[in-house]
UniProtKB/Swiss-Prot annotation:
It comes from Acinetobacter baumannii (strain SDF). It comes from the Bacteria. GO terms for molecular function: 2-C-methyl-D-erythritol 2,4-cyclodiphosphate synthase activity; metal ion binding. The gene is ispF. The keyword Lyase applies. The record marks H38, T137 as: Transition state stabilizer. 4-CDP-2-C-methyl-D-erythritol 2-phosphate binds at residues 12-14, 38-39, 60-62, 65-69, 136-139, 143, 146. One of its GO terms (biological process) is terpenoid biosynthetic process. Binds 1 divalent metal cation per subunit. A divalent metal cation binds at D12, H14, H46. InterPro entries: MECDP_synthase (IPR003526), MECDP_synthase_CS (IPR020555), MECDP_synthase_sf (IPR036571). This is 2-C-methyl-D-erythritol 2,4-cyclodiphosphate synthase. It holds the Pfam family YgbB.
Amino acid sequence: MVAQIRIGQGMDVHAFEEGKFVTLAGVQIPHTHGLKAHSDGDVVLHALCDALLGALALGDIGQHFPDTDPEFKGADSRVLLKHVYQLILDRGYHLNNADITVACERPKLAKYNLEMRQSIADVLNVDLNQISIKATTTEKLGFTGRQEGILATATVLISH
């Protein structure tokens, strides 16, 4: 039997607001600001959720967890990711790998890379080498360059 392979891509953006940390990939990272959001504002996990949902044409994170629903106010995005991944598993698919890029000037993320990757691997119950996270800047261009927020993109490969 030939394996069925699907690719999904997701993106998320959140603006900065008052706060003392940002949550990225389920990891609290000290910062001069937080992220404005209905849930915990974890752009990494939101982009990953959208990539997984997109791979099987299951809609997007806003359809599954609307920001108008008080149930998801302040929600831990690791719980959302676990729910989304269960939808993938229920359809007989599994994650081959995820490649994630985070764009921001600050906070600097290099020292949190392994912890963020491990956090995702733990939620999805996959090997660490299946999760890649890269951080970049936009060379001071655009809203991330002006330090107004953070952007994350995620690409996944899943197979049946």
